[in-house]
């Protein structure tokens, strides 16, 4: 068993060279290889469940491991990346490890090209895992994550059309890529719930009943017109929450 007891304890998000911020000019920020390890417990994992991890950003390159299994790499530095942990995760203790490399001169492995924005004259180089990390547990019929770079999935997309500014109304559209990783055909409804800025329910609506064969992936949609909306204007912003769910 690997002994990481003497490693520095940190919380995420974390830039290993964060203490250099505003003390050094950006071209002097430390660039090197840094490792992260996280031990976590999965108390119970059912046969119909899947587990995903999402990193919102690892700079510049990240190599990812779960329980000693190499999951893959990501070289962009500013985009999110995720992995399906299901094949290698287990009930009880698990450990995920990440090797990060924020070399100023980093070149992409496949093309040997540099990233133009990874430049001493442009972008402060805060290395490590400087963005959030999320762990998801889903059913084996699930809405995918917007992590196309590694998982080739597009996730959930919400947008508005048919704006009536004076009437304070618009049509809200939601669509989700849904995948059936079970061994049977499944039927479900796509439900959308919209909450106002105070968390109060504004509207719930559903799309048509959907049938998804085993192994099939499909984009499902639903839309509805909402009234009494708060539109953004100069000096005024208003955030709604949209939740999407699959209902048997």
What name fits each language-model region?
Residues 228-248:
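Terminal connector regions
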Residues 142-181:
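Surface beta-strand/loop "capping" patches
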Residues 91-92, 169, 213-217:
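Solvent-exposed, conformationally flexible loop/turn segments
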């Amino acid at each position: 068993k690997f002994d990481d007891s003497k490693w520095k304890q940190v919380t995420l998000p974390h830039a290993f060279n964060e203490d250099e911020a505003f003390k050094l000019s950006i071209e002097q920020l430390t660039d090197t290889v840094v490792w992260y390890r996280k031990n976590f417990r999965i108390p119970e994992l059912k046969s119909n469940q899947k587990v995903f991890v999402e990193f919102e950003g690892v700079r510049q390159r990240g190599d990812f491991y779960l329980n000693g299994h190499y999951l893959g790499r990501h070289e962009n530095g500013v985009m999110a990346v995720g992995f399906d942990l299901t094949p290698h995760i287990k009930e009880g203790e698990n450990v995920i490890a990440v090797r990060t490399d924020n070399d100023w001169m980093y070149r992409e492995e496949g093309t040997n090209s540099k990233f133009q924005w990874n430049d001493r004259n442009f972008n402060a180089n805060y290395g490590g895992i400087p963005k959030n990390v999320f762990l998801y547990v889903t059913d084996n019929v699930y809405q995918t994550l917007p992590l196309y770079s590694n998982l080739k999935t597009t996730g959930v997309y919400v947008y508005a059309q048919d704006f009536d500014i004076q009437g304070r109304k618009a049509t809200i559209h939601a669509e989700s890529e849904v995948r059936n990783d079970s061994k049977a055909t499944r039927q479900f409804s796509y439900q959308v719930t919209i909450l106002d800025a105070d968390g109060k329910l504004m509207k719930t609506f559903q799309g048509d009943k959907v049938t998804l064969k085993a192994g099939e992936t499909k984009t499902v949609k639903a839309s509805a017109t909402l009234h009494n909306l708060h539109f953004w204007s100069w000096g005024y912003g208003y955030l709604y929450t949209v939740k999407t769910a699959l209902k048997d």
